[in-house]
A protein has these predicted regions:
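Non-catalytic cap/lid and distal C-terminal segments of serine-dependent acyl enzymes
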Residues: 1-158
């Protein structure tokens, strides 16, 4: 972040950790497929610097490769993180998406089902979207971005 935010005009006043944390409401991170795994890990490690997250076609692998086989354990970790770091009050939003024809859809669907079964993950903080007929491809990614970015930066949540 310091390399980009130090060169371009952003909402951070400077590149100190304090300034980057203070400007977290103006920062999002998203990734597709293995980038989705990266997005979940960004949520786990960098919630102080980023408010909005867009994992597309993938689940959290906090507990090792193919973390989708440890769905409950990963969601337990995320839920505890939200509670311990007071993220409900500080603000966070996850737009999790996958296509109904995506070859890795079970990872996302299983994780979403577990998250949505818990009262911690309300629609104010977590949305799961399935693109009808969507595949593991750029067309799906474009739709996910089109839908998520206004929710992130449309004014009400910022």
């Amino acid at each position: 972040m310091p390399a980009v935010e130090g060169k371009y005009h952003t909402y951070a006043e400077d590149t100190t950790q304090e300034a980057l944390k203070a400007s977290r409401n103006h920062r999002a991170f998203g990734g597709f497929s293995l980038g989705s795994v990266t997005t979940w890990l960004q949520f786990c490690y960098d919630y102080d610097y980023i408010r909005y997250f867009l994992p597309m076609s993938g689940s959290c692998w906090y507990y090792g490769t193919y973390g989708d086989f440890q769905i409950e354990r990963n969601v337990d970790f995320i839920e505890n993180l939200v509670k311990e770091q007071n993220l409900d009050q500080r603000g966070y939003f996850i737009y999790h998406a996958v296509g109904t024809n995506d070859n890795v859809k079970s990872q996302s669907i299983d994780m979403a089902d577990e998250m949505l079964s818990r009262s911690t993950f309300t629609p104010d903080h977590y949305v799961f979207y399935q693109k009808d007929g969507g595949y593991h491809d750029l067309d799906a990614v474009q739709e996910y971005l089109y839908n998520a970015l206004p929710l992130f930066f449309g004014g009400e949540n910022t």
